[in-house]
Each structure stands twice: as C-alpha cells, then as structure tokens.
A protein has these predicted regions:
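A hydrophobic C-terminal alpha-helical subdomain
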Residues: 249-288
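Conserved Rossmann-fold NAD(P)-dependent oxidoreductase catalytic core, especially the SDR/UDP-sugar
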Residues: 89-131
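A conserved pocket-lining segment of Rossmann-fold NAD(P)-dependent short-chain dehydrogenase/reductase
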Residues: 175-198, 202-206, 221
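Amphipathic terminal alpha-helices
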Residues: 279-306
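NAD(P)H-binding glycine-rich loop region in Rossmannoid oxidoreductase-like domains
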Residues: 44-85, 89, 93, 110
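N-terminal Rossmann NAD(P)H-binding glycine-rich loop of SDR-like oxidoreductase domains
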Residues: 2-22
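Active-site Tyr-X1-5-Lys
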Residues: 127-155
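Mid/C-terminal beta-alpha module of Rossmann-like enzyme folds, strongest
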Residues: 205, 209-265, 298-305
C-alpha cells in the first residue's frame, strides 16, 4: 500500500492518476475527501499538532510525501509549521508504524548555485535565505536525523523546475504574457528543469524499490540535464512567431513594472528571471532516466521524448 500526501497538487495529482492507472494499492491523506471517492482516503492535516491516526499508516509499504506550502509569499511561520514540523510528525509516525520507505519531495532550491554536487545531504549546504527553500532544507535535515537509527529508508528527491502541457506559477505567467508579446526574452538566467511525467515515473520507481534509497541513492537531484535560459524557455512556450529578442534593458524595465503591479520587492522579478539555477547534467540514477524536453511539451498534449 502506498500512502500519498498532496494528491490534489500539481505533482501529486499526476502521481495519483499514474498509480491508479497502474492499479497500485493507494491510500490518500488530506484535509478533504472531495473527488476522492475512488480511492481509500484518510483525513490528515499537516498543521495538526497531534500524532497522525493509526489508520493512516496501517499496512503502508511506502509514504510519498508531496504535500506542503509552496506559495512564494506565505509566512515564515506557515512554512515552518507545515513544511518542517508537519513533515517531521508524519515521518515519526511512519517510523513508529514500521513503514519500510519514506519518499520526500523536496526542492532543488535547497542546493546553492555554486555547489559541486546537487545530491549531497542538506547539512553540507548553508541554510538558504529564502523562506520556502529554508523550510525544505530544515525538513531534509530533520528527516535525516529521524531516519538515522531505524530500518525505515529515506529517499529525498529534489526536482528541478517542473513543467507539463499544463503549466503553473511563473511558467504559466510567462506563457500568458507570450501570447501577445511579440519578442522572445533575452538569454539570461539558467534553469534545471524536469517534465512532470518524468518526475512521476521517478516517484513510482522509488515506491516500487527500483530507485532511491532501496538502490543506495538516498538523495536524488531530478532534472533532465538540459540548461534552459530565459530565451530558450520563452521560445518553447511561444505559440506565435516572434519578431526577435527583447533587449535586456527593456526586459529589466518590464520586470520593474511587474514588481510594482504585484507588490513584489523591487528587483524581485529580474532577479528571479536572471539568476542561475542550473545544476549540471542529469545524474545517472538506477531505475530511471528522463525522457522529455521542454520544447516538445505540447506534442500530443504533453511532453515528448528527447
């Protein structure tokens, strides 16, 4: 039995669909049973300070923990209460219930851009200054301690920026902007990315013991290995022919306007667009290999193979 949290989120919903299609024994944990009629469901709220009910983890062979707060401007206390404390409570309950394997979906933002490897344990990196990344870093460290002296295996997965035919967050904003804007973005910034379908395949492989800690890989940097700058991303997301490439000065000015319209700190949009978050070629991972690239994400309604 696989226990999945965050089944209504961007990654969790796709993972749930894949597991159901494969007829894998599945239990969902969440705050609401809405749209969960076809699956076993147990009420669970990460913000509850009490220990999870025993029924949550009964007969579970693997926990895949996708739930959490990801909003950029959530409060520091919410990040701490849900992403760190809630995750640790669930992990301790899994250990107490004798669950063999715990898979934690973290974030590549845990890794500094100048790190030599993106697959070191969190303790080898400085704590990030950004609140969301810091909460993931803190959760990773706490989980490592939680699973240090017992038989439950821990797999930490750090995905790059996740995409699919259906986009979310900043990629969705960029796609909407490019529907009417006639120019590509300049070649600034670098990103590691991963198709949602590939991430789902990796999570399924981990749950089945074919990848992750069961094969000796406790921390996985999950990317397709490609280096995506803003120009490449904007070209891939464009559905109309562009006239050329936007000058950097114009792009910077547009970012200032966006900061003002959305109430962001001055310079936030430009920093997000121009910063480097590329972590090198895709690592060799047992039982999994990425198949998709951003440029062909809309072919047949989703990402296509390289």
């Amino acid at each position: 039995m696989i226990l999945l949290t965050g089944a209504t989120g961007y990654v969790g919903a796709a993972l749930r669909a894949a597991l159901e299609q494969q007829q894998s024994p599945l239990r969902l944990a969440g705050r609401s049973a809405e749209h969960q009629e076809e699956c076993a469901w147990v009420h669970y709220d990460l913000s509850d300070e009490g220990a999870p009910a025993g029924a949550l983890l009964a007969d579970v062979s693997c926990v895949i923990h996708c739930a959490g707060v990801a909003h950029r401007y959530a409060s520091d206390s919410d990040f701490r209460r849900i992403n760190v404390e809630g995750t640790v409570r669930l992990a301790k309950a899994a250990v107490a219930a004798g669950v063999p394997h715990f898979v934690y979906v973290s974030s590549m933002n845990v890794v500094p851009v100048d790190a030599q490897s993106a697959q070191e344990r969190a303790e080898h990196y400085p704590e990030p200054s950004e609140a969301y990344a810091a909460s993931k870093w803190q959760a990773e460290r706490a989980l490592t301690e939680c699973f240090a002296n017992n038989d439950c295996l821990l797999t930490i997965i750090r995905p790059g920026l996740v995409y699919d035919a259906e986009l979310t967050a900043n990629l969705k904003t960029m796609e909407r902007f490019l529907r009417w804007w006639p120019l590509l973005f300049p070649a600034i910034g670098r990103r590691s990315m991963l198709a949602r379908a590939d991430l789902v395949d990796l999570l399924v492989s981990c749950a089945r013991g074919n990848a992750g800690a069961p094969t000796g890989e406790g921390v996985i940097a999950a990317t397709d290995g490609e280096c995506y700058d803003a120009q490449r991303i904007s070209r891939a997301l464009s559905v109309t022919t562009k006239w050329g490439v936007m000058p950097r000065w114009l792009c910077r000015m547009g970012c200032r306007v966006l900061d003002w319209l959305r109430g962001y700190p001055a310079g936030a949009s430009w920093q997000g667009l121009s910063s480097s978050h590329w972590y090198g070629p895709a690592p060799s991972i047992s039982g999994w290999q990425p198949r998709c690239v951003l440029e062909s994400r809309s072919v047949n309604g989703g990402p296509a193979s390289q």
